[in-house]
A protein has these predicted regions:
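ATP-dependent carboxylate/acyl-activation modules
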Residues: 1-188
Length: 188
């Protein structure tokens, strides 16, 4: 039987840099190949695949935002500005820190020269993170909210950090709303 494939997924690949393995090397990205591998993730949206890919890098990130080290760059605005202007492995984390500091997507674009589409996607993730932080508890999330948060790629640990509860409590509430992980087949 013939059928037309549907392209209803996004693939995001993110290189993995390990400058700690190369003492004396500058953690600045240039035209020279410096990655030691990459992570690839598939999702229904760019935000979902982006969050999944960041988790897959094995660098301690739970995704984009709601990580244990969030806010570390805020103490030194000049270091944050340098992390945004100079291509480096932590640049994507620096963009999150820039949003935390109150910068707009346009401010960040001027410093990074990132495409505005990606910055709008990241800004939406940041706004969703702040919305989650503003909730009084996991009971504030109805099934539609859960589906939207998951569509953006937020994992249970990120939601738990936002709500200041355990990952187990998040999982129990999510399953209580009948929102479960699922696998999809890629048709091409």
């Amino acid at each position: 039987a013939s059928f037309e494939p549907s392209i209803d997924y996004v693939i995001t690949k993110i290189p993995r840099f390990a400058f700690e393995k190369f003492p004396g090397s500058e953690p600045i990205l240039t035209t020279q190949m410096k990655s030691v591998g990459e992570a690839m993730a598939v999702g229904r949206t760019w935000q979902e695949s982006f969050n999944k890919a960041l988790r897959s890098l094995e660098t301690g990130l739970n995704g984009w935002g709601l990580n244990p080290k969030d806010g570390e760059m805020l103490a030194d605005p000049e270091a944050l500005k340098k992390a945004l202007t100079v291509p480096n492995p932590a640049r994507v984390v620096a963009i999150h820190e820039a949003f935390m500091s109150g910068m707009t997507a346009e401010d960040i674009r001027k410093l990074t020269d990132f495409d505005p589409w990606y910055l709008r996607q990241m800004e939406d993730l940041f706004q969703t993170e702040n919305w989650l932080k503003g909730l009084s508890g996991v009971s504030d999330l109805d099934k539609q909210d859960w589906l939207e948060v998951k569509r953006r790629g937020f994992c249970d640990i990120q939601i738990a950090r936002a709500l200041k509860i355990t990952e187990g409590e998040v999982r129990k509430a999510r399953i209580g709303q009948d929102v479960r992980a699922s696998l999809k087949r890629v048709d091409t």
